[in-house]
From Swiss-Prot:
MF GO annotations: ATP binding; DNA binding; DNA topoisomerase type II (double strand cut, ATP-hydrolyzing) activity; magnesium ion binding
Record's protein name: Type 2 DNA topoisomerase 6 subunit A
Taxonomic placement: Archaea, Methanobacteriati, Methanobacteriota, Archaeoglobi, Archaeoglobales
Keywords per UniProt: ATP-binding, DNA-binding, Isomerase, Magnesium, Metal-binding, Nucleotide-binding, Topoisomerase
Catalytic activity: ATP-dependent breakage, passage and rejoining of double-stranded DNA
Keyword Transcription regulation attached: no
Function: Relaxes both positive and negative superturns and exhibits a strong decatenase activity.
Length: 360
């Protein structure tokens, strides 16, 4: 067992020890965990990311619901202890199904077990990967002038993310910290929400023309994708820009990359890239380019109003853009730029926006 895994195991056992000590002292056991809401995140000046504040939620056995939560946590810790000792791993989905045999500690649905794993991350200051818990989702793909070194079952190999891959690109592994950056000729990184737009840039040779590393986000990005973007920015000193659809859900995708997500604010210093810049699609672009658009739904309007009270978006840029979007009552997709031809996005829109941002 690696040293970091030994420390992780000690931290997990420490939680159970704390519960036991409270019960031995005749106390009702309880745990205090950071509240995971937008009202409990604060800006860390040193790391420039959003992290949890001082508000705590109490998991107490005083209530039946609280007692079940603590019971389920002890079962999960017991499972993780065995898994670490055997050097095995499991997925979040497998953990949910394994609980079928735990009687009263069985999870009713997977989101419940997922949240409990997040609780353990917060309580121990370790990541789920240190518990040997893997996500279901794959990491996204990368294509561009970057050479990486990775360990495989057959040993160490080097891969050039342009020359040694097909149009699908290089698959980002679950544990990004296991890959090493060997060298690169890149000038910036562009993270793209949709597969269709990612394919358009690749087909048009955008990565070659502008020495860009293209990262496909696949919608809301996996942790591995966000970790890769942070490493490319901090270790290789490459500017990172994010290109999404023009709707509130896509702005949240940008926020998870740049500021850190509310759900995983305990990992913001590891996953977030505060230097990341938003390319578009902006509401300003919808008006400026007269893009094909859909009317905002009630859910869209509700989400936009929520953004106006989200501290991560507390800037003049976002206030102006969100208020404009509410005013025009429209949203547009990235691919709406095809109104002006398939090459417009790579020949006109992106060069103009990247020049405005000082990237090219």
């Amino acid at each position: 067992m690696k040293e970091i895994e030994r420390r992780c195991l000690r931290a997990l056992i420490g939680i159970v020890q704390n519960i036991y000590d409270q019960m031995k002292a005749g106390q009702v056991p309880e745990l205090h965990i950071a509240t995971r809401t937008k009202y409990n995140i604060e800006f860390n000046e040193e790391s420039e990311v959003w992290v949890y504040g001082d508000r705590k939620s109490v998991r107490s056995a005083k209530t039946v619901k609280g007692a079940y939560r603590i019971l389920k946590m002890t079962y999960v810790i017991g499972f993780l202890k065995e898994q670490l000792n055997l050097n095995k791993s499991s997925t979040l989905r497998e953990l949910y199904y394994i609980s079928e045999g735990w009687g009263a500690a069985k999870f009713e649905e997977q989101p419940e077990s997922d949240r409990l794993v997040e609780d353990l991350e917060i309580l121990t200051n370790f990541q789920r990967e240190h518990f040997h818990i893997r996500p279901e989702e794959d990491g996204a793909t990368v294509i561009g002038p970057l050479r990486v070194r990775e360990e495989t079952r057959r040993g160490v190999r080097e891969i050039h993310c342009q020359d040694d891959v097909g149009e699908g690109g290089y698959q980002i592994p679950v544990n990004v910290d296991k890959i090493e950056f060997v060298d690169h000729d890149a000038k910036f990184v562009i993270a793209i929400e949709t597969g269709g737009m990612r394919d358009r840039l690749v087909e048009n040779g955008f990565d070659e023309k502008y020495d860009a590393i293209i990262v496909h986000l696949k919608g809301q990005p996996a942790r591995s994708t966000r970790r890769l973007l942070r490493r490319l920015n901090t270790e290789l000193n490459l500017p990172v820009v994010v290109f999404t659809d023009g709707d509130p859900w896509s702005y949240r995708i940008f926020a998870s990359v740049a500021y850190g997500s509310i759900k995983s604010a305990h990992l913001s210093e590891y996953l977030a890239t505060p230097a990341a810049q938003f390319v578009g699609i902006r509401p300003t672009d919808i008006v400026k380019y007269d893009l094909p658009a859909d009317k905002l739904t009630e859910e869209d309007i509700k989400a936009l109003n929520a953004i106006l009270t989200d501290p991560r978006f507390d800037s003049e840029f976002w206030k102006k853009e969100v208020n404009l979007q509410l005013e025009i009552n429209k949203k547009s997709e990235q691919q709406a730029l095809a109104k002006y031809g398939l090459d417009y996005v790579t020949d006109v829109y992106l060069p103009e926006r990247l020049s405005e941002l000082g990237v090219i």
